[in-house]
């Protein structure tokens, strides 16, 4: 009986020691390499969000990033209410939103910019229309003809256009379809309409889906004075394209966990190369140094 008691005590001590060692090992593992978070973002940012998060979890397989698509304004609301861990935004917060951020998070508002995207105006490939101007866009929104197709209110694309043209949501009229890809596909049916989509939806140079979408549309350059500007990397870099959008992360994570790890990964060299491969303009430019050795 006594020997059984001793054996039980030794077994319990062994299990306790193993658990302690496992706990110590886990505690020694950096927080940004393990754990689970939810990243929420507008439909406009699907491709870049997937590319960055998928690469991150390949580097850190013990990290899990759940992806959630919503309207841009809904993503901000969910972050402020602690329903998600981080979001992608393309517009600046209003003064009221900044005050709410300060009250809800107790953290400084610190946007982490990582890419330049754009709002694109696209038509069916057979359309005779060659370009569009900001003045024309404003007139179409106010006319009631609903020739512009957006992906709904409170979305990144509509937010950017309204902000640029200094218009209020209640004063504009437009057609609506859910999803940037759906808008592009609908232009074959609605040949007299103009689709308003994110550049990121079609920017992947060699992406099979992006290529398929590009083949059926024509991107309208925006006319400014006598110049025409397309949403290409150079015009996004200089922001000469009038509807350039700067994408950034926001998180209320108070430690250097998976959320802040993803931010650092996305904003430094490797992440910026991924941004470039997605066809977007990297926000942070890393100069390449070439050492020439004279013999």
Where are the regions that the model predicts?
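Sec-dependent bacterial lipoprotein signal peptides
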Residues: 1-16
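Short, conserved acidic/polar surface loops in the N-terminal third of protein domains
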Residues: 9, 98-100, 133
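Exported/periplasmic ABC-transporter solute-binding proteins
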Residues: 18-60, 110-117, 122-295
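Short, conserved beta-strand segments within well-ordered enzyme catalytic domains
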Residues: 40, 66, 85-88
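Glycine-centered small-residue hotspots that permit tight backbone geometry or close packing
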Residues: 41-42, 71-75, 82, 261
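Central regulatory/effector-binding core of bacterial HTH transcription factors
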Residues: 61-77
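Pocket-flanking alpha-helical
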Residues: 73-104
